[in-house]
């Protein structure tokens, strides 16, 4: 009897490890575009299926060992009921210049139902909660060490300055997530947040692409418009 119980425990441990390997944060392979100064990180917390009892996303971002985003970082959030800003551009909300002034304001984490959310938002009959946060970088190099961590339930997708850099692996979330994308449309995917204090993050390392100010108005656009107006006057 003792041997049978021990064998059962081993099987459960192996199954748990296999599930952890299947359900983990995974880097997209795209370089994270990061500027010196202000940057934008955006995250979608994704439910597994309709009627989910809880949803969570907490993000941590470290650059060369310095934490620039963490639990308690100021953010905005919304639970979408349509693609934002449009069906033609369902991830346009991840861009730095997107106007989120009408979104709810609070601090990471975001979600509902499990007492680990600073900004409580959402309900189980909708698939996602979107969040955005501005963070400051004083120094960045192409060889900077960038570590992205997330504590989440059930899935997540994360963008930096409009570029997807990581997501939960082995879900049914499409390549370009829409407002009604669930993690489980037959895959059986499920993932629980740590519910620890402080959060227990899953980490990935990101390569870096150093960029200019992502919030800046493009001078070239201004010039083209002005020149077009000048020509139109003749």
Label every model-predicted segment:
Residues 217-234:
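Short acidic, low-complexity intrinsically disordered linear motifs used
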Residues 23-114, 136, 145-153, 160-179, ...:
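Accessory carbohydrate-binding/adhesion or oligomerization-edge regions at the termini
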Residues 2-10:
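Sec-dependent signal peptide recognition
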Residues 14-21:
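C-terminal segment of classical bacterial N-terminal signal peptides
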């Amino acid at each position: 009897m003792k041997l049978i119980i021990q064998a059962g425990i081993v099987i459960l441990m192996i199954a748990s490890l296999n599930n952890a390997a299947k359900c983990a944060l995974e880097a997209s392979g795209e370089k994270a575009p990061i500027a010196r100064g202000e940057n934008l990180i955006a995250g979608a917390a994704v439910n597994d299926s309709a009627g989910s009892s809880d949803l969570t996303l907490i993000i941590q971002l470290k650059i060369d060992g310095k934490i620039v985003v963490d639990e308690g970082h100021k953010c905005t959030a919304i639970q979408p009921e349509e693609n934002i800003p449009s069906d033609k551009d369902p991830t346009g909300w991840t861009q730095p210049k997107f106007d989120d002034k009408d979104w709810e304001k609070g601090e990471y984490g975001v979600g509902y139902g499990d007492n680990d959310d600073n900004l409580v938002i959402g309900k189980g009959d909708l698939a996602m909660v979107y969040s955005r946060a501005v963070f400051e970088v004083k120094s960045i190099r192409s060889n900077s060490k960038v570590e992205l961590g997330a504590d989440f339930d059930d899935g997540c997708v994360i963008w930096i300055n409009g570029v997807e850099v990581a997501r939960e692996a082995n879900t049914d979330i499409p390549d370009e997530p829409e407002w009604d994308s669930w993690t489980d449309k037959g895959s059986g995917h499920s993932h629980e947040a740590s519910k620890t204090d402080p959060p227990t993050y899953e980490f990935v390392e990101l390569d870096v692409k150093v960029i200019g100010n992502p919030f800046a108005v493009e001078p070239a656009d201004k010039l083209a418009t002005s020149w077009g107006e000048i020509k139109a006057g003749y």
